[in-house]
A protein has these predicted regions:
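Active-site neighborhoods and metal-handling regions in enzymes and metal-associated proteins
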Residues: 23-485
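Bacterial N-terminal signal peptides that target proteins for export
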Residues: 1-7
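Sec/Tat signal peptide C-region and signal peptidase I cleavage site
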Residues: 18-22
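Bacterial N-terminal signal peptides
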Residues: 8-16
Length: 485
């Protein structure tokens, strides 16, 4: 097997340059959609062109927007993307990797879907098949997706000279706070449309920050208390009393996918299995460590395995480790393939994968799907564990399985088929075309090795899509264990 060594500093520089090159080759619909935040819209995804992303946005406006607004009986949806949540000029150190996220200007849940980092966007259901789409204040990347786009107020930035002139010329029109400039004229706009129920992006029961796909870029819960006060004043008492939380509407909009998104979801992975298999420099047993080969974790384990303690432990013949989705076994002298007890783990993995794919159904809640999968696992002689940790007290002949399937690619983890997370994650019903991270962990005991010794495999976010047939894969799943000679 051909092997290559790359030292950590070179690796970092390579991926930095690769990211910059990919961004120039595949321009995004909005700067700053990173693989750390929106996994379906990676800058390295060859399908994620601006034209494709704009097409998806318009398709969702046509198909998903009327559906979710009417399901929630919302006549008008006012979504305020606050311009002060993130600064485009700040350098942030995330995960101790010295990553520069200065292009990420907003953590609003719908910043991609609406194509804006700062705006007041209003959708009105006036009957018919189409929802009126208005950018009342702010800027968007795709103005053609909207019916009306009013220019951004020059008074959002308090450092502009125009604000000084405006205050002098209109002393009685100046709002009490600069936050009020965004809503000037909105009361008249709403009055002309006379909505009965107005959905606004503030939270009452859900925490989008808690439900975020990555904690380093947690989604916001919506407008602030001050925003609510200024918006209420702009609408007047009559329409302010008609405001309700749009939190469930937002969640439904995020979880409903159109076909174009499924194309991107598959295209944003690593491609074929051959393309995902690592090529390693010759491993020297007793010298080369897991860190040297950029491995993720050891698969051959004691019952009380501590992965952090093993990162610098030299690899030995007969060890199995995982890098990305792929498991690797280091052959012992004289072996031409892994022994049967090692190969058996893959039979168990495939069995778990099939049970999952056949028992996630459109319309079930995450909790219902979890129970269904657990029942099937136990029916196949496996043991379910509610945390990713080998349980030495269970039957030593039973393979133990932990589950944490959840939505990926939209920034939020719900719906979630897992014992983890807030309750609303698993209360959420599973919609058609849900983009699902198929994440499960298999701990298979090997009694002949000794008590508690086992083989571990983690399916980390295999890309699944929920259809009428169950879970289907947007990318071919891993097919087996790779041998290292």
């Amino acid at each position: 097997m051909k092997k290559v060594t790359i030292f950590p500093v070179i690796i970092y520089m390579f991926f930095l340059l690769w990211e910059l090159d990919a961004q120039s080759e595949y321009p995004e619909a909005m700067v700053g959609i990173s693989h750390a935040y929106y996994t379906s819209f990676d800058s390295d995804n060859p399908f994620a062109t601006k034209e494709m992303l704009d097409h998806i946005r318009r398709e969702k406006f046509d198909l998903v927007l009327p559906l979710v607004m009417r399901e929630h009986k919302i006549d008008m949806w006012i979504h305020v993307i606050r311009p002060w949540t993130w600064s485009g000029n700040e350098f942030r150190k995330l995960e101790h990797m010295n990553l520069n996220y200065r292009s990420i200007d907003s953590s609003d849940p719908l910043r991609y879907e609406f194509g804006s980092n700062a705006a007041v966007i209003v959708f009105t259901d006036q009957g018919g098949d189409r929802i009126e789409r208005v950018v009342f204040e702010g800027e968007v990347n795709d103005p053609g997706a909207f019916d009306i786009v009013r220019r951004q107020s020059p008074f959002i930035n308090q450092e502009n000279y125009e604000i000084m002139d405006y205050v002098k010329e209109n002393p009685y029109k100046v709002p009490a706070s600069e936050m009020g400039y965004r809503f000037m004229g909105l009361g008249k706009f709403v009055l002309e449309r006379d909505p009965k129920r107005i959905g606004v992006n503030y939270a009452e029961t859900l925490s989008f920050a808690e439900g975020s796909e990555t904690y380093t870029l947690a989604l916001t819960d919506g407008i602030s208390y001050a925003d609510h006060l200024h918006l209420s004043k702009a609408l007047g008492d009559k329409y302010a009393r008609r405001m309700v939380s749009a939190e469930h509407l937002i969640l439904d909009y995020l979880t409903r996918s159109v076909l174009g998104e499924i194309v991107l979801f598959g295209g944003s992975g690593r491609g074929s299995e051959e393309g995902r298999i690592q090529q390693f420099d010759p491993i020297v047993p007793g010298v080369t460590t897991l860190m040297d080969v950029e491995g993720g974790w050891y698969c051959t384990r004691e019952w009380d395995h501590d992965e952090e303690a093993f990162s610098s432990v030299p690899l030995r013949r007969g060890d199995m480790f995982q890098s990305g989705q792929i498991p690797y076994y280091i052959l012992k002298d004289g072996e031409v393939k892994p022994p049967q007890e090692v190969l058996r783990i893959w039979d168990e993995v495939v069995k778990v994968r099939k049970i999952i794919s056949r028992n996630v159904r459109v319309g079930d809640t995450g909790r219902e799907a979890l129970k269904q999968i657990i029942d099937k696992l136990e029916g196949e002689g496996m043991a379910y564990i509610d945390r990713d940790r080998y349980d030495v007290t269970l039957d030593p002949k039973k393979t133990q399985v932990h589950l944490d399937l959840h939505q990926v690619g939209k920034g939020v983890l719900a719906p979630r088929i897992s014992p983890m997370g807030p309750r609303w994650h698993s209360d959420k019903k599973i919609p058609l075309l849900l983009t699902l991270g198929v994440e499960y962990m298999v701990h298979m005991p090997v009694p002949k090795w000794g008590k508690g010794k086992h083989i571990y495999y983690c399916s980390l976010h295999e890309r699944g899509v929920v259809t009428e047939r169950g879970v289907e894969f947007a990318l071919p799943p891993v097919s087996g264990i790779q041998s290292i000679r």
